[in-house]
């Protein structure tokens, strides 16, 4: 092989937003060790929408927290955009979470005394290159709910405000932990449509973790987790629109 040629695997790693290699996570519970992750190898690529699918206890939330800089692996390496998160200082991790990652959780965590617009502004005021709060809310189809308080919004609308809050700082990556877990299927589909719109229109690399296998059909790739390991990776050659999903 000529010295100028590149190994295809190395090229793939170079194009990855995240490169995860040999990641293990062990929690010490008294005298008992709990292995949440066991030797995870994974690349995530710019602009793709990935669903991480697994039952409760499969390790998917732990993996998402490590990708988001909320937790660190016991062993292994996590690289983001070429930088090593596993060697980052707490100050560097804080900057990473603040400027590069948007989080969406199962529960919305909106500030009850602030309107939808004001909940978004809390984030944009501390961001480097934020969207206008109105623009973020319009992107999730809530342009007519700008001045409503959380108590005046349905569960699905509150979750869409949470998505708007996450994307308003213009993150490179959107990490979603069971974003439809507290919603009925009809409302959940509206939330998934908002996530799809963000992924397609902004090009935000998006990872959604869920136990709901139906959601996997809208993803570019599906990462199956079981017992702390990646058991299977599927590529959807033909993706379904969220409106075509049912559960």
Language-model segment annotations:
Residues 1-26, 232-247:
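ABC-family P-loop ATPase nucleotide-binding domain
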Residues 16-225, 230:
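ABC family nucleotide-binding domain
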């Amino acid at each position: 092989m000529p010295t100028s040629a590149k190994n295809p695997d190395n090229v793939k790693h170079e194009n990855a937003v995240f490169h995860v290699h040999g990641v293990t996570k062990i929690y010490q519970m008294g005298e008992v060790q709990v292995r949440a992750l066991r030797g995870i190898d994974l690349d995530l690529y710019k602009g793709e929408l990935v669903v991480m699918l697994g039952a409760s206890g499969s390790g998917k939330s732990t993996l998402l927290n490590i990708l988001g800089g909320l937790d660190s692996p016991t062993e292994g390496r996590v690289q983001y955009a070429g930088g090593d998160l596993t060697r980052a200082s707490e100050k560097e991790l804080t900057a990473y979470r603040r400027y590069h990652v948007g989080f969406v959780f199962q529960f919305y965590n909106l500030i009850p005394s602030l309107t939808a617009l004001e909940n978004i502004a809390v984030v944009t005021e501390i961001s480097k290159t934020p969207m206008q709060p109105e623009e973020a809310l319009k992107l999730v189809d809530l342009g007519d709910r700008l001045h409503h308080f959380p108590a005046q919004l349905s569960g699905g609308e509150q979750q869409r405000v949470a998505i708007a809050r996450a994307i308003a700082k213009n993150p490179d990556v959107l990490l979603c932990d069971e974003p439809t877990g507290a919603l009925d299927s009809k409302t959940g589909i509206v939330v998934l449509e908002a996530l799809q719109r963000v992924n397609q229109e902004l090009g935000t690399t998006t990872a959604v973790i869920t136990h709901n296998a139906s959601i996997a059909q809208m993803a570019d790739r599906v990462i199956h987790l079981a017992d702390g390991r990646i058991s299977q990776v599927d590529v959807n050659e033909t993706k379904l629109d969220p409106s075509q999903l049912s559960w």
